[in-house]
Design a protein with these regions (language model features):
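Sequence/structural signature of beta-propeller domains
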Residues: 1-469
Length: 469
C-alpha cells in the first residue's frame, strides 16, 4: 500500500475485517475503503420510512463513498428545493485509498496513491432518478458537499485537495476549496471533464498573518446558501483559520478579510480569474471573508465548525465537531479532552450591532467523552492503539433544522466521535435531535435526544430537512 505506489510502499497490518481493517491507517496515512451510499428517508422522530440505494455497480452511472472519510456526504437541497445533492467518487466498491487518489485530469506525481478517480456530484430528483456530474476538482482529497443553484443552473461545491509535497501543482491548488461547475445531462461515460473552476479563495495574509501552505487555507467542510450568499466552514487541518466564511461577489464586504455580506449581492455565476504562472506562490485571488464575529485565530485548537443552518436572518446554528483528541482516562472510563470541551456541540449565534455573537452552546444529552456500546462492535481495547474500541461523542458535524409554529426550532445533527480506533471516521456515530427556543438567552432545558446509533459497519453522514415529505 498505497495502491499504485512505486516508492515507500508498506505492507498491510490488518485484513479486510471491520473495523480492524482501518488499523491499516497506522502504516498508510491515505487508507480508506470505498463503500455503497444509502439514503434513508426518516420522520422527524427518527423512524425510517424507506431506504434508497445509490447506484454503485460498474455497469452504468454510479457513485460511492470513501468509508471512513468522516467529512464527506453532506446533503443539501437545491436553492428551489427540487433536488438533493451530495458528492462521492466514481470508483468501484471495495477500492482502497480512493479519497486520497488523484483525479484523472489533475495528477500530482508526488501523491503516494498512484491511482486516479473522478469526484462527482449526485443529484437526486423528485421522481427518484439520479444524475451525475464528474469533476477533476479535489485531486488528492475529497469533495464534501454540493448545492445546485437552480436559477443559474450551477453547482457549488466544497472540499479539500492535495496529498503530495509542497509546492502543490497548479491544478491541485485551483481544484481545492470552493468550486463551481455546470451540471451535466450526459451519462458519466460520455462526459468530457475539464479542469477545476474555483469560485472562492481565502488567504490568511488578508488578516495580517504570515502566509502558510498555498491551497490549504481553502480546506472547506460545511456548505450552505442563505439569502443568496454562499457560506463555507473550515474546521480541520494545520493551516488557515477554523471559522465560518462567505463568498463576497461584490468585492466590497471585507477589505481587511472580515465582514458581513452586502445586501442584494448576487450568487457566484462564474469562476475566479487567476494567473497559473503565479498560483503556486500567491494562491487564488481572495474573494472570501471571515463572517464578522467568528474566530480569526490561525491554527485554532478551540474552534472546529462544520455544518451551518440559518433559522432566520439573525439566528444561525453552527455544529462544532470537537478537537478529535482521544486522550483517555482508564480510571474514569472517559475521553477527558472530549468531555472538557466548552465549544463542541451546537452553537447558537445571533447577529446584532454589525457582528455575529455566540449566545450559547448546547451540549446536554450528547454525553461528550462517554463511551457507548454498539451491537456487534468489538469490546475491549484495540491492540494497535491500546485504547477502547467503544466510541464516544466528540461534537457534531452536518446538521439541519426547521422553525416550528410555536417559536421553537428543531435541529437534527450527526455526531463526530473519538475512540481507540486508528481511524475514528470508521466509528458508528449517532443521529441526534434537540429543540431550542428562538428567543432563549441560555441553553437551560435544551437536551439532545439520540434518534439512531449507527450499526457496526455503518456510519451516518449527511442530514437534510425536506419540507412536506
Amino acid at each position: 500500500m498505497p495502491p499504485g505506489c512505486t516508492t515507500d510502499c508498506v505492507t498491510a497490518v490488518a485484513d479486510g475485517g471491520y473495523p480492524e481493517v482501518f488499523n491499516n491507517e497506522s502504516v498508510d496515512g491515505s487508507f480508506g475503503v470505498t463503500s455503497p451510499i444509502l439514503l434513508d428517508t426518516i420522520t422527524p422522530s427518527g423512524h425510517t420510512m424507506r431506504t434508497l440505494d445509490v447506484p454503485s455497480g460498474p455497469n452504468g452511472d454510479h457513485l460511492v463513498s470513501s468509508f471512513s472519510s468522516k467529512s464527506e456526504l453532506g446533503l443539501n437541497l437545491s436553492t428551489n428545493g427540487s433536488a438533493l445533492t451530495f458528492m462521492g467518487y466514481v470508483a468501484p466498491v471495495g477500492a482502497v485509498d480512493v479519497s486520497n487518489s488523484n483525479t484523472p485530469g489533475v495528477v500530482d506525481p508526488t501523491n503516494p496513491v498512484g491511482e486516479s478517480f473522478y469526484r462527482a456530484v449526485a443529484e437526486l430528483h423528485g421522481n427518484g432518478s439520479f444524475s451525475y456530474t464528474e469533476t477533476n476538482a479535489y485531486s488528492g482529497n475529497n469533495g464534501r458537499a454540493a448545492i445546485l443553484d437552480s436559477a443559474d443552473n450551477k453547482l457549488f461545491m466544497s472540499g479539500n485537495a492535495g496529498n503530495g509535497s509542497n509546492p502543490q501543482p497548479v491544478g491541485v491548488i485551483a481544484g481545492a476549496g470552493a468550486q463551481l461547475t455546470t451540471p451535466s445531462t450526459l451519462p458519466e461515460s460520455e462526459q468530457q471533464v475539464g479542469q477545476p473552476t474555483p469560485m472562492g479563495g481565502f488567504n490568511i495574509t488578508a488578516l495580517g498573518d504570515k502566509a502558510d501552505k498555498v491551497g490549504k487555507d481553502d480546506n472547506f467542510r460545511g456548505l450552505t446558501v442563505h439569502d443568496n450568499v454562499v457560506y463555507l466552514t473550515k474546521g480541520s487541518g494545520g493551516n488557515g483559520v477554523n471559522t465560518v466564511y462567505f463568498i463576497d461577489t461584490t468585492g466590497k464586504a471585507c477589505p481587511s478579510g472580515v465582514g458581513l455580506p452586502v445586501p442584494g449581492a448576487p450568487l457566484p455565476t462564474s469562476g475566479l480569474s487567476y494567473n497559473p504562472a503565479t498560483l503556486q506562490s500567491t494562491g487564488l485571488p481572495e474573494n472570501m471573508c471571515v463572517l464578522a464575529g467568528f474566530p480569526t485565530a490561525t491554527k485554532s485548537t478551540t474552534s472546529f465548525p462544520f455544518g451551518v443552518w440559518f433559522a432566520n436572518d439573525t439566528t444561525m446554528y453552527v455544529a462544532d465537531e470537537g478537537s478529535g483528541s482521544n486522550t483517555y482516562d482508564a480510571a474514569t472510563g472517559s475521553y477527558t479532552d472530549a468531555a472538557a470541551q466548552t465549544g463542541a456541540g451546537l452553537q447558537k449565534w445571533e447577529l446584532s450591532d454589525g457582528s455575529w455573537k455566540l449566545a450559547y452552546t448546547i451540549q446536554s444529552g450528547l454525553d461528550l467523552g462517554t463511551p457507548y456500546a454498539v451491537s456487534g462492535y468489538p469490546t475491549g481495547d484495540n491492540p494497535v492503539t491500546g485504547l477502547p474500541w467503544a466510541p464516544a461523542t466528540d461534537g457534531l458535524r452536518n446538521l439541519t433544522g426547521e422553525v416550528n409554529p410555536d417559536g421553537t426550532v428543531s435541529v437534527w445533527a450527526v455526531t463526530s466521535t473519538v475512540s481507540g480506533a486508528t481511524d475514528e471516521g470508521a466509528d458508528p456515530n449517532r443521529l441526534v435531535r434537540v429543540t431550542d427556543h428562538l428567543d432563549a438567552t441560555s441553553a437551560a432545558g435544551d437536551t439532545f435526544r439520540t434518534l439512531r446509533t449507527a450499526q457496526s459497519g455503518e456510519a451516518l453522514r449527511g442530514i437534510v430537512y425536506v419540507p412536506g415529505q
